[in-house]
Amino acid sequence: MNWSNPMGEKMGYCKPTFMNIPQEKREKILSVAVNEFAYNGFENANINTIAKKAEVSVGSLYKYFDTKTDLFLTSVDYALNNLEIIMETIVESDEDVMIKLEKLIRVAIEFSRRNTVLIKLYNEVTSESKAELVKKIAEHVESITSQAYKKAVIDGQVAGEIRTDIDPGMAAFFVDNLLMNIQFSYACDYYCERYKIYAGEDIFQKDEFAIENILRFIKAALKSNQ
C-alpha cells in the first residue's frame, strides 16, 4: 500500500504527525496494530503491547493517534484499502455485470488467502459490540462500496442485464453480504470449518467449482430474462 501521500478524508483518523514519520515506521505500527486488533478484538487489544511490538513508546502512539479508536479505524483502513480499490476498479469498469461479479468473486478468494490477518480484522470489525464504534465503522467501511455496488446494479438494469423488479439497494446489499461471507470462508477459522461442512472437505482445492456455483446462484437471482 502506498502511504507516501497524506491520507484523504477516508483515512482521516491519524494526526498529521503520523504522516511525517518514515513510511517503513508507519507500516510497522499499523501491521502490528492490525494483528493485535484481529486476534484480540477492540476491547482486549492493548496499546502497550502494540507500542512494544512496534518498537515505539506509548507516548509516541498518542502523538500519532488521539485515541485507541482512531488507531483502530486507521488499522481498518490499512487492512481494507487495497481490497476496496481493486473492487471499486472492477465495479466501475464498462464490462457486463456478470463478468464484474466473477472478477469480484475471484478477487475475494485470492485476497483472503493472501491476507488472512487483514480479513480476520474485517471479521472482528463486523462483530464489534460497542454501539458508537459500530456506527462509525459501518459508515466508514461500507459507504463507498455500497454506492459502487448499487450503481453497478442500476447500470445493469438499464442495460437489461439485471431484472428490474429487484430494488438496487437490496440487490447490492445481498451481493456484498455474499462477497463478505466468501472472504471470511477463506480466512476465518469458524467460517472455514462451516464452509467445509456445507461444501465438502476438499472445497479449498476446488476454486473453479466454487466460483461456477456462486455465479450460477447469483445469475438465478439477478439475471434478466430479456
Annotate the PLM regions.
Residues 81-84, 88-89, 132-161, 169-173, ...:
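Amphipathic alpha-helical packing segments from all-alpha helical-bundle domains
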